[in-house]
Structure formats: structure tokens, C-alpha cells
């Protein structure tokens, strides 16, 4: 069921994390939200790569879009008579952008698109790059709105939902993936209650998700990550809805650390588990989750909150950013191409090919 026509996008889709000005890429600095609304101006591809690595911009679709504009900025620093010549000169910048966040497949996918159009371009290769970067952003927004309606159609009226990390407008070109489903579900009066996990250590749920929902006038309840199983046992939620940074050929899904344990708890308590992501997040070349490189960040991120240290000196920490949820724990993967129920290799191949 697709009820996108009944969604008031003026209310539910007005936050934009990226703005191309024609001269630079303006990024809403997500490290400073919700108390400071400030933009980072990126005038070079290296500035974009740093913004991606430092989490000024985050969310798999958003960093792919940012990388596309990063290539446009890199193009201003070289001279070339054709796209193929430019591609050789731009390769170092492309590699630096790709290395900024290794787990999210959207980053490599966006850069591959830029490479492909550049290789075939003539003397107008700079214009070709700019058009492709804009197309990546436009297609993402359209996909998110479509996925929102598809995912909402799976939810029975009166349901409660739990989400993790931030998968909204801040993580995409707009509207969001998992949060787009929640927005659509609220607009269609299918969802009665929204819960959001805080998502340590960067607190994307606490700092970003509940702030986004507040901007839309959606009442959301924040919980500690450790309260999720108890919440499910209470019967207050019928769905856990998350995004994805990489979806493998068998349905295994890499997402923000903590997603795996939510899927385990959801299966135990009879709560359904939905993954929402554009098809650009699907990586049919990766057989299963064991093949995914899991990004490790500075252990120091676990030592405090808001710049205040809460851990004694001399303590060691382990800080993986993502985990992998096995496909057999996922009830539905929603992309703009449709819904894959109980994903496995055969169903994924039927939807996305080999």
C-alpha cells in the first residue's frame, strides 16, 4: 500500500542537512545539535572528507551525497580537456573521500557513479559532474518518500515503534529512511507512539532523532539503550525500525552498533524488525555480514559525554561503530524497489539480481 499522496511533506519534510550553494557545500553540523544550529562550509574535497570522517555529516545516504559534491569541488583544482583525463587527476581525491567512512556502501556507490559519468564525459565534464551530484541527491529524496509510504503500509494502525540512531532528514537528502517510515506512519495515523534509543556513544538518537521529531510536532519518548528489551516486554512497541549502512546479498545488514541486540530482543519478544534503506545501500557483491569491514573509532569517545570525562584514567575501551544483524532476524527490508519479506539470498537475488 502506498499512501504517499496523503502525507503533508510541508510539515514532515523541511529539514535539510546539505546545501549546495554553487560555490561550496554547506553542511548542518550534526556534532553541535540540538543546542547549536550551525553550518560547516566546505570549499574543497578534503574539507568534505574531513566533515564525513568527523561526523559533521553522517548517515549513509547523506555522506554519499556529500561525497558527490566533494568530487565537484575537487574538479575545480585541476585542468583537463576531457572526462577521462580528469578522472586520472581526480583519483587521489576520490580515494581520500572513499576512505573517510569505510563501512557505508553509499559512499563508494556515489563515487562510482561520479567515476562512471566522468569517464564518458567530453569537454563539459565539470557540468556533467555537477548534474550527477544533484541527481544523486534528488533521487535519494524521491526514494525516501516512496520507502516511507511502503514501510508505513506494513504497520497496523495503533502500533508503537522503536527506532535506533538517526535515520531521518539529517541522515539523507530529506524525509529519512527508517524515520521516513515513522513520519509516514504518523501522518497516516498508523503509529500511535514513537520511542527512540539514545544511541551511545555519539547519542544520535538523543541529540538528533528526538530533535527532528520535535521539529515535526511528533511526540517521541527517549529511552536508554539498555531499556529496549524491557520496553519490548511491556508490549508498547510492535515494530523496531532501523536504517542500514550496508545490506549484503543474503540480507545480513550492517547498521549502527546496537542494532543487532535490538533484533535479538525483538525476535524473543515477538516484535517485528524492519530495515529501511535505498537500493544504493544494497551490496550484492558482499555475500554476507562476515565480509563487511567494521569501522572502529577512537576509544576515547566512550570516556565521557559532552566533553565531560566520566571514566577513570587508565581504562581501556572498544568502540566499533557498526554491527551486523543476520538476515534471518529481519522481518522486512524496505527499499524504493519494494519490500523484501524474510530476506535471504534467493529473495535478495530476485529483487536485486546477482
Swiss-Prot record:
**Classification lineage:** Bacteria, Pseudomonadati, Pseudomonadota, Gammaproteobacteria, Lysobacterales
What the protein does?
Catalyzes the interconversion of methylthioribose-1-phosphate (MTR-1-P) into methylthioribulose-1-phosphate (MTRu-1-P).
User: Which protein is depicted?
Assistant: Methylthioribose-1-phosphate isomerase
Q: Does the keyword Isomerase apply?
A: yes
NCBIfam families, from UniProt? eIF-2B_rel, PRK05720.1, salvage_mtnA
Query: Where are the active-site residues found?
Result: 245 (proton donor)
Q: One MF term from GO for this chain?
A: S-methyl-5-thioribose-1-phosphate isomerase activity
GO BP term (any one): L-methionine salvage from methylthioadenosine
**Which family would the database say this protein is a member of?**
Belongs to the eIF-2B alpha/beta/delta subunits family. MtnA subfamily.
Would I find S-adenosyl-L-methionine among this entry's keywords?
no
State the reactions this protein catalyses.
5-(methylsulfanyl)-alpha-D-ribose 1-phosphate = 5-(methylsulfanyl)-D-ribulose 1-phosphate
Keywords for the protein's UniProt record, in alphabetical order = Amino-acid biosynthesis, Isomerase, Methionine biosynthesis
Tell me what organism the protein belongs to: Xanthomonas campestris pv. campestris (strain ATCC 33913 / DSM 3586 / NCPPB 528 / LMG 568 / P 25)
